[in-house]
Amino acid sequence: YFIREIKDKNLVKSVKDFPVYVDSPLAKRATTIFCGDLRGYLDEEALALVQDGTHMFSFPGLHLTETVEESKLLNMDRTPKVILSASGMCDAGRIRHHLKYNLWRPESSIVFVGFQSPGTLGRTLLDGAPSVKLFGEEVAVRAKVVNFQGLSSHADHDHLVNWISQFKEPKPQ
């Protein structure tokens, strides 16, 4: 949603029309599901966008990768891009390959949007490690590492209380 808005408003002046890659088979399937009718699941702001014809999870330049080969090609192409990769703590999955090929590049940014537990690679990066070990190699951290608070996909306390309050008393068994 936010990336689509950034692209729509041309907020990244240095790269006119950067591509965005969702690099996770599960995220690809979830995105496909969310491209359906979501009217019963959206807040007022999101519903207004949909009613105006905005596609919440689709925009020009969005690419959904699925295969390992597609994922590997992203690291071989030096075109400026956004790669959205799963494994929030960076301890497994495709993100580790993206980190290996991009952490050492000062023009890269590694952006976290969720909590990083102590002892994870994600927390190590946020804590400012000068280098990390990936696939048996020491990789210098020259990329800018940032954490955006408030974008986690997990519900907060108020949302959880609101959700659970919608349930009726359980039926006797």
Label each region the model flagged.
Residues 1-173:
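Acidic/His-rich, metal-assisted hydrolase cores and their charged scaffolds
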